[in-house]
């Protein structure tokens, strides 16, 4: 399917599905998938990787923690495939974990109840029990779910007369941590406690704690959203 992504399209694609395998490259889309899977009780296999590292976990609505529960327990990396690269074996290992769990589900076998975390370069594989990660107040899988990803999404608006696109992130930005990690990666960053300024592929970019992001030097929403997804998803 070639189309602009939105929750309505995802809901149509989700009809009659037995299991969803994560092949996405950003968390905005993953949270949509997570909430759709919770709402319609569809098992899905989360998987992501960057560099030589990867993570995978089978999410079963009503039984396991969902992605929103897990995210606070997983390593907080702002690196992406665009900023840090990725080696093919990490992709292949992540896909192997995901497809194995999908085959278990489709054949009636019980999937594992632990999060697989690996660094294939170092030869390290760990399995972390996930049961205690479940949040009873989670807005996606708790006692009173509201499925926030299906209600809100990042928006992009061209600012009149300023050759600038404003992106509004669904949540807040942790600017201090982001500035520190981007500096460690060699990026030129200014941070003063109130905002962060950097450059993304030649575009001066300003980020605010409330989730607003200004990308200067363009009026193209598609280009601005692409930069946002590359560096801050």
Model regions: which residues?
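A structural detector for beta-sheet-dominated domains
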Residues: 121, 168-170, 198, 208, ...
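Cytosolic Rossmann-like ligand/nucleotide-binding regulatory domains
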Residues: 185-209
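Conserved SAM/SAH-binding loop
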Residues: 1-8
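Conserved residues at beta->alpha junctions
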Residues: 4, 24, 218
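Generic C-terminus detector
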Residues: 201-233
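Glycine-rich phosphate/adenylate-binding loop
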Residues: 9-19, 23-170, 175-180, 189-194
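Residues that form generic nucleotide/phosphate-binding pockets
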Residues: 178-185, 227-230
